[in-house]
From Swiss-Prot:
Matching InterPro entries: RNA_pol_II_repeat_euk (IPR000684), Znf_C2H2_sf (IPR036236), Znf_C2H2_type (IPR013087)
Record's comment on post-translational modification: May be phosphorylated at residue 'Ser-5' of the tandem heptapeptide repeats in the N-terminus. Phosphorylation might be increased upon RAS pathway activation and negatively regulate protein stability.
Main location: nucleus
Taxonomic source organism: Homo sapiens
Chain intervals with Polar residues compositional bias: 107-119, 149-166
Lineage: Eukaryota, Metazoa, Chordata, Craniata, Vertebrata
Protein name: Zinc finger protein 768
Effect of S160A: No effect on protein stability
Subcellular location field: Nucleus; Chromosome
Protein family membership: Belongs to the krueppel C2H2-type zinc-finger protein family.
Amino acid sequence: MEREALPWGLEPQDVQSSDEMRSPEGYLRGNMSENEEEEISQQEGSGDYEVEEIPFGLEPQSPGFEPQSPEFEPQSPRFEPESPGFESRSPGLVPPSPEFAPRSPESDSQSPEFESQSPRYEPQSPGYEPRSPGYEPRSPGYESESSRYESQNTELKTQSPEFEAQSSKFQEGAEMLLNPEEKSPLNISVGVHPLDSFTQGFGEQPTGDLPIGPPFEMPTGALLSTPQFEMLQNPLGLTGALRGPGRRGGRARGGQGPRPNICGICGKSFGRGSTLIQHQRIHTGEKPYKCEVCSKAFSQSSDLIKHQRTHTGERPYKCPRCGKAFADSSYLLRHQRTHSGQKPYKCPHCGKAFGDSSYLLRHQRTHSHERPYSCTECGKCYSQNSSLRSHQRVHTGQRPFSCGICGKSFSQRSALIPHARSHAREKPFKCPECGKRFGQSSVLAIHARTHLPGRTYSCPDCGKTFNRSSTLIQHQRSHTGERPYRCAVCGKGFCRSSTLLQHHRVHSGERPYKCDDCGKAFSQSSDLIRHQRTHAAGRR
């Protein structure tokens, strides 16, 4: 009888037919001695032997079976080495540890609570679980298939050196966490950040298995000035302008607090480094923010944003009372004070109150006689920048404000408003003494001086009196021969700006004064008045 060819690495006594391996009876015979098999064969021949039916998936247990300890790794009886030179693994698998020795068949049958493992599998790290929680033990027939059984354990057994190195590091880290006093020279508590050790003693809530204390409360007062809290609030050790806005570096609410950022030119101090940088642009004249439309430059980005709204016409700030819109929030705040009547800015000299700080500043210059804005052409000084701009239009001849009815233009907006009243024959300003009405408040003020004795201005050269100081100044130029207003086209000089304006119309051909009766136009208002008298004489 020829011996059947066996798979590589298996001994003859380990080979059984596939039918026997897949049935419970065949599995029992594989675990019996020769005498027991002969007795069973005789009983089968005589028909006296009855095979007890075994539920599928369970293995028979011998009477002397004892459950193994958790450390014991149960092995399959099909692949136990019979000789020292036995090799039952495919190429590429890691050799088994010499600590594993052949076991008796009694250890093959395990309780359902123990899971069957491969003899080549070893846990790589403490607590490693190769199976999912829902794993169920396989049936005996399934476990007897060596090829499928070995393929399940190949990935678990063939681990790379990097995985073993990571496992050793993980084990060392776990030991350090479990024994912080022995492993860590810093004596850091488990689960606590190193910076949290500075807050010990201030009521922090510990983590881990330590007893839970009261909830954390931020300390105040002198505790905030301790080095521990100083390090927590400024871990990089920044000071001054480098720190920027912060709780300790910035300005406190209410205008109080440290101001470590000092200007080296004027000595003014600031709570924030960015505010100091903006302030220094006043001394240097730097204007890094430039408008792309008109090329106007600004020292602050916020001023550029406000300026750009003049080009776009955007007015995002709207009054909830009257619906009037503004391009800047400060303008809206100033406008809302007109509804409430609030005037928080009071002059310390005369007690007069104003709704805006700029109005108060402008008023205070009347007490100090300060005139910081000077004209580069004639050297005349003004207390307001707007007054200087209006004056400069006299030299340039610019008239940006024009009347929508007759087309007459003016260098100042304040001059256009009373002119518009002349078309409506409106004269809202009335003299309380004589009842005479005027279209401008300034003209009424000049007229009122005629009723007050001693309120006139007299010329020291000829004794002529005037109701306005500006008229006296113009008169004095007739004695001195001064002609500060000069034409840019022909170079002719004049003592009054109004006379220069009339002269400009000779070069431009402008005739802004038009007769309503015949439509004839004139360059001067006096010529129009003289012409209108001809129509009035004809009506008579």
